[in-house]
Amino acid sequence: MTAQLQSESTSKIVLVTGGAGYIGSHTVVELIENGYDCVVADNLSNSTYDSVARLEVLTKHHIPFYEVDLCDRKGLEKVFKEYKIDSVIHFAGLKAVGESTQIPLRYYHNNILGTVVLLELMQQYNVSKFVFSSSATVYGDATRFPNMIPIPEECPLGPTNPYGHTKYAIENILNDLYNSDKKSWKFAILRYFNPIGAHPSGLIGEDPLGIPNNLLPYMAQVAVGRREKLYIFGDDYDSRDGTPIRDYIHVVDLAKGHIAALQYLEAYNENEGLCREWNLGSGKGSTVFEVYHAFCKASGIDLPYKVTGRRAGDVLNLTAKPDRAKRELKWQTELQVEDSCKDLWKWTTENPFGYQLRGVEARFSAEDMRYDARFVTIGAGTRFQATFANLGASIVDLKVNGQSVVLGYENEEGYLNPDSAYIGATIGRYANRISKGKFSLCNKDYQLTVNNGVNANHSSIGSFHRKRFLGPIIQNPSKDVFTAEYMLIDNEKDTEFPGDLLVTIQYTVNVAQKSLEMVYKGKLTAGEATPINLTNHSYFNLNKPYGDTIEGTEIMVRSKKSVDVDKNMIPTGNIVDREIATFNSTKPTVLGPKNPQFDCCFVVDENAKPSQINTLNNELTLIVKAFHPDSNITLEVLSTEPTYQFYTGDFLSAGYEARQGFAIEPGRYIDAINQENWKDCVTLKNGETYGSKIVYRFS
């Protein structure tokens, strides 16, 4: 991934420290939308990698991530060695005012030393542009001075807590460093006030660990029942309603302010340095009660609250004077407190526990502990759990009542085996065989690498099973239900197929119903048309604890009707009957140690003339039932697709023996791209959406 980002991108690379956090993650979105590439470094002490995984899907970009403490010079230097960093936006640091008064040494060590190490590495690797996330806390109590509300940048500084002192110290370090070399360093110091809200997508937001320190996150937790009531500290101030006045700024506006500052540094005189401060705020103060009522309106809930005494150190009014930013950075806020409350409520309702979901576990799947090489388990500790991988968006494991029922590997190495048999993987762009690897589309002929006899199978060298998907976005929309969304950007230059294709896979795990639903979608982002046929290639063994074989498995299918194929496994144009039990049969077909053998494409309706590129609105049809009497586990496979390949695993490899698992692969017809009767259902044109659904249901 490192080499890929370096070689493929001509964009400037911005190192975002603390980029997994609240403000950092929103700034990464804005950076990518403005054409930058990002590398994120974060020690995850007050954040989680899940925000970065969501950012990848939200921005449709791979975001290299390093779990590193800035005080770890050797660990941080890896970033500068592996990427040509153009600039740095520095968010990383401890940030709780109250906590800083209890553990001041930790704040001084982490915030100041971490920044010094970062600046030393920037100097060593000739990186001169630096945007610093400072804070309005450097002003202290600005009300002690006449005519300093709203607060201008010229207001004398006087922080009143260790957190503020660390920000003040770092500002002084930046000024000293600039004065030592006024031709090279370009520093933007951004002092901002009260960030609130969340991204309007609802995918990222503030997720404080422990009790929230700020007003809006606390109210949100009261609204969803995580806290009993809101506490308002004082209603006897000389304000409109007796509560203090603060300058609240939507986090998206704040993120855009960082882009404006970075672009200002980039446009500044090439032969001159700079160290300058800007306030980022709305310039409009809102009282605590005004924000309270705005959030109650957005949520439709009258939150319980209690007025208590003033907190020590609280003052009447802390509002920014943002004129300098408006004049020089050409930046100003666009969103209101009401917008912030609406976006925060969307984030809260869709993610009531933030990124912290019970029943979700993740572990590294590769020795180098890469975050884009993880196995994520959903439903951990329940009677039905599913484990997925970024590589191939693969199903690594399914456990029913604690018993594994699919084949898989303990680590990523098994899936990277050249002879992996596609175990558990998403198959695409085109599942199954294409005759001689040839097809024609839009008056152009294409040749795929032949990899299966005389044919191309499962997309040949462009198969998705070796490609690393972005994400996942994991959510828990309701009790017992989890979703995991993966995304792949499959560009024409990385495959033998035409067009740039965006693919999303949403897995829905219902632990109560013991079901796994897969929804596949695909859209062309460039190009006229492409062949497409997506499926999953899991191998099932319903009796794994008792035997490494599918022997004894009882099978019934919807229909005996199957696509007739020639000696090269390519359709002849006929539909034939296979010797296999259907749902109407009195007895199932029982799989033995060697026979019967199947590698057949069964059809759901022999009279159908499929033309749909999107089958998501079709009826979800039961196509296969499998049962093993020793384990007493039943598998039902349902699909919206017109066919399903049933394969008894007679040529399994890569650490597995023949008939250790069987595969059910719902999808489109074999070689449909070369069959006029079926070609429409596998030809995705620009502007269309490919769609299909598969469900595995256990009992």
Swiss-Prot record:
Keyword field contains Disulfide bond: no
Triggers of expression: By galactose.
SUPFAM superfamilies named among the record's database cross-references: Galactose mutarotase-like, NAD(P)-binding Rossmann-fold domains
Gene Ontology cellular component list: cytosol
Pathway it works in: Carbohydrate metabolism; galactose metabolism; Carbohydrate metabolism; hexose metabolism
Cofactor dependency: NAD(+)
InterPro entries referenced in this protein's UniProt entry, alphabetically: Ald1_epimerase_CS, Aldose_1/G6P_1-epimerase, Gal_mutarotase_sf_dom, Galactose_mutarotase-like, GH-type_carb-bd, NAD(P)-bd_dom, NAD(P)-bd_dom_sf, UDP_G4E
Domain of life the protein comes from: Eukaryota
GO BP terms in the entry: galactose catabolic process via UDP-galactose, Leloir pathway; monosaccharide metabolic process
Sample GO molecular function, one term: carbohydrate binding
Catalytic reaction equation(s): UDP-alpha-D-glucose = UDP-alpha-D-galactose; alpha-D-glucose = beta-D-glucose
Protein residues bound to NAD(+): 13-44
Gene3D superfamilies named among the record's database cross-references: 2.70.98.10, NAD(P)-binding Rossmann-like Domain (3.40.50.720), UDP-galactose 4-epimerase, domain 1 (3.90.25.10)
Protein purpose: Mutarotase converts alpha-aldose to the beta-anomer. It is active on D-glucose, L-arabinose, D-xylose, D-galactose, maltose and lactose.
Protein name: Bifunctional protein GAL10
Record organism: Saccharomyces cerevisiae (strain ATCC 204508 / S288c) (Baker's yeast)
Gene assigned in the entry: GAL10
